């Protein structure tokens, strides 16, 4: 099943390229990492078709990106005490603070796009620096999803 992502036109072409590459590196993994995932995510220009919306916005000091989950009709779903959703969601908003992102290396800007998309697909934080799901502030050096990140996707989606 195809899932779609949408990019708000407030992003520069540079950030649009970061987002597109981040998505591609989650989807096209067999040749590069030897792990095949069942996910298919394609870009759409029709926001109503999208389940992953990339938005530009201002976040709290030091926060690079934030993913929020919604039910149809716009109801925001809150995370429980364990940081998990207690209900299924219909779509996710991935908000990126480009002014804060501009203070980190370019490769980590793209990695942050991939990190937030990982959340939108259901992954939580890891403290392993080689995982895309490690926060930049916790020492992330990954530039794309690792084999273990992809195996976690396979666990969720197969």
Residue ranges and their predicted role:
Residues 1-20:
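Fold-level signature of zinc-dependent metallopeptidase catalytic domains
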Residues 7-9, 56, 98, 135:
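Pocket-edge structural micro-motifs
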Residues 16-114, 120:
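Metzincin-family zinc-dependent endopeptidase catalytic domain
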Residues 1, 5-6, 26, 115, ...:
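Broad hydrophobic/π-residue packing in well-ordered secondary structure
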Residues 81-108, 124-158:
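Metalloprotease/metallohydrolase-associated module, dominated by Zn2+-dependent proteases
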Residues 3-5, 52, 94, 131:
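A broad, low-specificity signal marking well-ordered, structured residues that form hydrophobic/aromatic
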């Amino acid at each position: 099943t195809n899932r779609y992502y949408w990019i708000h036109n407030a992003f520069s072409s540079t950030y649009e390229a970061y987002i597109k590459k981040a998505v591609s590196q989650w989807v096209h993994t067999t040749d590069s990492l030897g792990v095949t995932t069942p996910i298919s995510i394609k870009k759409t220009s029709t926001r109503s078709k999208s389940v992953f919306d990339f938005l530009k916005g201002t976040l709290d000091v030091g926060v690079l990106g934030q993913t929020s989950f919604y039910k149809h009709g716009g109801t925001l779903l809150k995370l429980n005490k364990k940081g998990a959703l207690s209900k299924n969601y219909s779509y996710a908003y991935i908000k990126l603070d480009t002014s804060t992102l501009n203070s980190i290396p370019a490769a980590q800007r793209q990695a942050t796009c991939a990190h937030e998309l990982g959340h939108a697909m259901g992954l939580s934080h890891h403290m392993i620096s080689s995982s895309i799901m490690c926060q930049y502030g916790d020492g992330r050096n990954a530039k794309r999803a690792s084999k273990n990140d992809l195996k976690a996707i396979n666990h969720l989606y197969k």
